[in-house]
Each structure stands twice: as C-alpha cells, then as structure tokens.
Amino acid sequence: MPRKGPAPKRPLINDPVYGSPLVTQLVNKILLDGKKSTAERIVYQALEQAREKTGTDPVVTLKRALDNVKPALEVRSRRVGGATYQVPVEVRPGRSTTLALRWLVTFSRARREKTMVERLANELLDASNGLGAAVKRREDTHKMAEANKAFAHYRW
C-alpha cells in the first residue's frame, strides 16, 4: 500500500456550455472508448431536449434529478468471524453524486427509446419527477440499509 496517502483529487473543469462541473461529470460518465466529443454531443442534446420539454434551465433539471437519485445510505460487506454481514453506512457526498450519475447513465442505456439522447433526456426528466429506474435503485439501496439496520454496530 502507498505510504503517502490517497492521491489528491484533480479539480474538475466546468463545461464550456453550461459552466457546471456536474455536466462535466455527466459527460465523463457517458464517455465510451475515449470519444469525448460524441459524449458531449449526447449530453448537450439531451439537456436541450429536457429544456424543450420542461421549459426550465436544464442544469436545474439535472440537479433536481441528482437530488432524487443520490443515496444517503448503502450497505457494505463486513466479515465478522465466519459470517459476512451487510452493514449499512452513510454515503459520502462525493460518492453519492458519483453513484447517482452512474445509475442515471446505466439506466439510460437500458431504456427502450431509439437514440441515447432520447434515453438520457427521458431518464433525467423521470428522475427529476421522482420516477424512473434510477430512483427505484436508490429506494432499493435504502431498503437494504433499513433491513440490515441491526448490523449497524459493525460499522467501521
């Protein structure tokens, strides 16, 4: 293990169109095979579609969607004796944002719409309204944590 501690976080550059680090993170999550310009096109068109459907600022829609998808608790496996327990732990703010973006992208890819732009736009709109698969994933995660509350004293 390295003795110098964890590597410092690199600062995220705000995206050129909306000036938001969240949009930059979303672009980086959409990214496949290093095709950044394709990822940017998908994200910007999806945000533009969201603006057309709602009539509000797409960054506000994205933030609202993230707030509805961010988990507060998750379970982590902890081995005690011969048994493995699912121990509920609080999620750090940075990790909760990362998980929310990851879930949004994963469930966008699984949707049935024709293009990725439509899928992402509709998943963002669903999430901002408290619907969709990503919000369900968060609720399932919270249910798991609630069900395993008895093992909370094994937290580390």
Swiss-Prot record:
It comes from Rhodococcus erythropolis (strain PR4 / NBRC 100887). GO terms for molecular function: rRNA binding; structural constituent of ribosome; tRNA binding. Belongs to the universal ribosomal protein uS7 family. The keyword RNA-binding applies. The keyword tRNA-binding applies. InterPro entries: Ribosomal_uS7, Ribosomal_uS7_bac/org-type, Ribosomal_uS7_CS, Ribosomal_uS7_dom, Ribosomal_uS7_dom_sf. CDD domains: uS7_Bacteria. GO terms for cellular component: small ribosomal subunit. Part of the 30S ribosomal subunit. Contacts proteins S9 and S11. PANTHER family: RIBOSOMAL PROTEIN S7. This is Small ribosomal subunit protein uS7. Pfam families: Ribosomal_S7. Keywords: Ribonucleoprotein, Ribosomal protein, RNA-binding, rRNA-binding, tRNA-binding. GO terms for biological process: translation. The gene is rpsG. One of the primary rRNA binding proteins, it binds directly to 16S rRNA where it nucleates assembly of the head domain of the 30S subunit. Is located at the subunit interface close to the decoding center, probably blocks exit of the E-site tRNA.
